Every structure is written in structure tokens, then in C-alpha cells.
Amino acid sequence: MSATAPFKTLSAKAAFQLDQELMSTGEFSIDQLMELAGLAVAKTIYKEYPPNETTTTTKNKFNPNKVLVLVGPGNNGGDGLVAARHLKLWNYDPIIYYPKRPASNQLYSRLIKQLQDLNVPELTTLTEVKHLLDSRDSKIKIIIDSIFGFSFKPPIREPFKDLINYLGQNHDHLPPIVSVDIPSGWDVDEGPGTEIDIQASCLISLTAPKPCAKLFVNSGPDKIHYLGGRFINPRIAKEYGIEDIVNKYQGDELIVKL
């Protein structure tokens, strides 16, 4: 779906300031925000790419709802880990690739332990990722791009440069890519630069859309754009001029299609 009604956006600077305000005067903890953001990502996946029934035979149980979650080193990656946990509980079969982890961070260690307790497998090399995606019988239904968020500054560095290059160069035969907040590799305010574009099919803007979201919805036909992260109070919404965004939610919705 291409762009329809206009929507307000938050620049990278404003998004950073809003995040800081949420965790100071707003009294939110980082794990609260990450849990709500990751839940919004999972709900978007469920709505746009609902799970198929798992088939059971006498010999094995086949889950056709495989999801590859590409996890970055920061909060965006944490959102992906949370989403993977929810999806596992909703009859998906997530697999994570997490090549660069924060050192000695209890929050991320807990998220990983939660996935391990659910028997969520982890790939450890890019070669494994390529083999999985290039295999005709891989059955990957969706790729979640939770590598870089709104704080990303180019250029893209390893261990993610080769991964993003691979996604961009092979997007024609890959399953749909769902990007969390920003298509990884894009500048939050300016959009895609001269580097490879991963050609995401769906974008989930968190808190409020960033300027690159407008470029995303106009970058091709059938682009899907959702808003998630319903935790902004009216005072903050007014302060940042995003009342119209907050008011798009209806009833108990945690996500809304823009």
C-alpha cells in the first residue's frame, strides 16, 4: 500500500529527546519500553503475516511459520528479541541471529535466557544465515530487521555490513523484510543513502514515525506501514506535536496501520 494520509514525524534529535524524557520525568524503565515496542512488532507480524496451522505427523511436527530475526547491538535489537519471544508463544518458529552483543548487560542476557527457555535456536555466523535463506526448503516466512534504530549513523560497519549487503543484493528472492522503526542502513532523517537498500516490505514506526518513514511508503508499491509503541501521555504528545499520531489508536489497540 502506498502513502495515503499525511502523518507527522519526529527527527532523530527529537526522537532521542523524547526517549530520554520518557525515562526521566516519564518514569519508564528501558525494559518497559522495550517490552511494549517488541509486543507491537509481534502484533504487526501476526496481523500482516498470520501463522499457518502447524501440521503434525506420526514422525515429526512441522511448523511453517519460521521467522528469522536479525538482531542488532542496541535497543532496536532488544525490540527484536522481545518480538521473537511473543511470536514463539503465538505458533511461530523464530530463529535469531545476534552477532554483536552488549558486554555484561543484564537486560539483554535475560532476554536471551527467555528465548533459550523456549528453545529458540540461534545462528552464529553469516554463512549460516545465507545457507538458511538460500536453501529451497528453508521455509522462512518473514525476516525481522531489528538491526539499527533511529540512533544509527552511517557508514554501516561489520559484522552488519556484509549482512545488509546480502539482503539488499538478494531481496528479489528473499521473504518479506519487516523493519523495526528504521530500515537498517537508512539515515533516520534522509532515508537511503548511497549504500545498499534492504528493500523492506513493511515498516513498524515506534512511538512516532521518523522522517524516513515518508520516503519508505513512497519507495515502491504495496509498502506496509504500522505505528506501535502506545505509551505516550498527552502532555508529551503535545510537547512534541504528535497528538494526531497518538490519537490514531482506537480502543485497546497497540498498533495501527497508517
From Swiss-Prot:
Binding site for K(+): 76, 145, 184
Subcellular location as annotated: Cytoplasm; Mitochondrion
Cofactor details (free text): Binds 1 potassium ion per subunit.
Obligatory cofactor(s): K(+)
Keywords on record: Cytoplasm, Isomerase, Metal-binding, Mitochondrion, NAD, NADP, Nucleotide-binding, Potassium
HAMAP family for this protein: NADHX_epimerase
A cellular-component GO term for this protein: mitochondrion
Domain (YjeF N-terminal) ranges: 15-244
Chief location bin: cytoplasm
Substrates-to-products reaction catalysed: (6R)-NADHX = (6S)-NADHX; (6R)-NADPHX = (6S)-NADPHX
EC annotation from Swiss-Prot or TrEMBL: 5.1.99.6
Protein name (Swiss-Prot/TrEMBL): NAD(P)H-hydrate epimerase
Protein purpose: Catalyzes the epimerization of the S- and R-forms of NAD(P)HX, a damaged form of NAD(P)H that is a result of enzymatic or heat-dependent hydration. This is a prerequisite for the S-specific NAD(P)H-hydrate dehydratase to allow the repair of both epimers of NAD(P)HX.
Family classification: Belongs to the NnrE/AIBP family.
Binding-site residues for (6S)-NADPHX, renumbered to this chain: 75-79, 149-155, 181
GO molecular function: metal ion binding; NAD(P)HX epimerase activity; nucleotide binding
